[in-house]
Amino acid sequence: MHQNVLMKDRFFIRVLLFILSIVFLAECAKRGRPEGGPKDEDAPIMVTAKPPHFTTNFREKEIKIYFDEYIKLKDLQTQLVVSPPLKYQPIIVPQGTPSKYISIKILDTLKSNTTYTFNFGESVIDNTEGNILHNFKYVFSTGDIIDSLKVNGTVKDAFEREADKNITVMLYEFNKEFTDSIIYKEKPLYVANTLDTTAWEITNIKEGKYLLVGLKDVAKNYLFNPKNDKIGFVKEVISVPKDTSYTLNLFEETLPFKLQRVAEAKKNKMLIGYEGEIDSIKIEPLFGPDDFESITLFEKTKDTANVWFKGSVADSLLFRVKTGNVIDTAKVMLRSKEIDSLQISINAKGVLNLRDHIKIAGNIPLQSIDTSKVYFVDKDTLKVPYSYQLKKEKTEAFVEIDFDKKYNDKYNLTLYPDAVTDFLGNANKDTLNFNFTTKKPTDYGNLYLTLQNVKSYPIIVQLITEKGELIEEVYATEQQEYNFTNLPPTKYLVRVIYDDNKNKKRDAGNFLQKIQPEKVIYYPTVLDIRANWDMSETFLLE
């Protein structure tokens, strides 16, 4: 009996110890506030560091930074900025688990007489409530002094309304070895990052002269790649110290034309892939045929040109590609026997806005229309007088139909067989019916815009949607009023482009040529256009 009691007591003690150990371990892992206690709203505090913060004559390979509570590192890969950049990424713990210290193992050979900054951004948080230790830095110098000068400023996008996040801002020392090509092949001396803001600050800089550059550094390698990266720069070399804040306008450089690939897509159609920005391509066969003709349209969203051609072409085509001052040659093998069938569409899908024309387009560029095979009537089946134009733009060739629109009316447009013909001679085989309506003027709004403080002409005034879709563009060479009428109710933006070189389009900058992008100014507020409403706005350009 006594033995049974002892066994039960021992079992009870073991169970109790097991439960207590689980509770203890859980509390150790959690390190949280007592249930019902006040919420912890304090950020972690650095207690000490080995070697100490602001150490000079630094020679260590490992740094340990201690805090007053358990911390975690969040988004360290994007938040941490080491200046000057290191060739090899340091090993940093903890990552994913809580700890009372940060360990940094340096794998590089450090530069002599240089101040290094480890800026953790917003990555250091406490383990329980996620309170952020904002802009936490650890600084040391391999020389006798800690450099203490700084440079700051903001970034903006040269064309878009909002700037990108995580812009890398860099300083290159301007010395006797300096060349502009340094940004393509060497890491900068000092760096900072805007993170999720538009502001930046580079600290712990030594006195001197520097090239100041900002990058949307896609590869995160501190090197400028014009194919992928946006760049902004200050044209003149800057001096530190100087009581100046700098704004970097980031843009994508326009790459020179480069032919990349040529392939047959269908019979009498080939694709030309290219690099760069171009407005037109001319195709010239090198060895005939004499009856060769072609038409080129560009894709809207990728660097590809669609080329339709006709003539007595055999099983291959050797041709010259000309664009501007660039000439290249290419060859395409012609094996396809299948030609595209013509497919017709119009822009009036349900409702035709009062400000729009009817646009008849095809998957193959349209070349003619037979008006005897077009039937256009209103809701009373009365014939609608119209005029038409054959138009070719950069991305499409189409038939545009204009007519006097009646308000709140219904229309039917019928294309009988052979009404429209494409570049290759195909015509629509079936009868095509398109029904659409118009609305009342009171269903639309109007915007009347006045510009003030225009520095120079010509300018390009654009009305766009919040998504960046171009609604209307006005090219102005002198002071005038800008009337945007019959606008569907939605939200719009206005931007003004200074066309400095008078080529009727926006031009980007170029780093090596030290050309800044043409200036773009957005109206500061979104314009909410409402039905049956006139809006008058004055835009003061700064």
Predicted stretch roles:
Residues M1-C28:
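Sec-dependent bacterial lipoprotein signal peptides
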Residues D9, E27-L215, K227-F233, E252-D443, ...:
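Acidic, low-complexity Ser/Thr/Gly/Pro-rich repeat segments typical of extracellular/periplasmic
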Residues H134-N135, D217-T254, M333-D340, L424-L432, ...:
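Structured interaction patches on ligand/partner-binding surfaces of diverse proteins
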Residues N175, K216-A219, E275, V454, ...:
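Short, flexible beta-strand-to-coil junctions
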Residues F257, P365, I369, V454-K455, ...:
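Compositionally biased, intrinsically disordered linkers/stalks adjacent to structured regions
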Residues Y411, L415, N486-L487, L493-D499, ...:
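Short beta-strand and adjacent turn/loop elements
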Residues N426, V454-I464, Y492:
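C-terminal structured domain segments across diverse proteins
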Residues N446-L447:
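Intrinsically disordered, low-complexity terminal regions enriched in Ser/Thr/Pro/Gly
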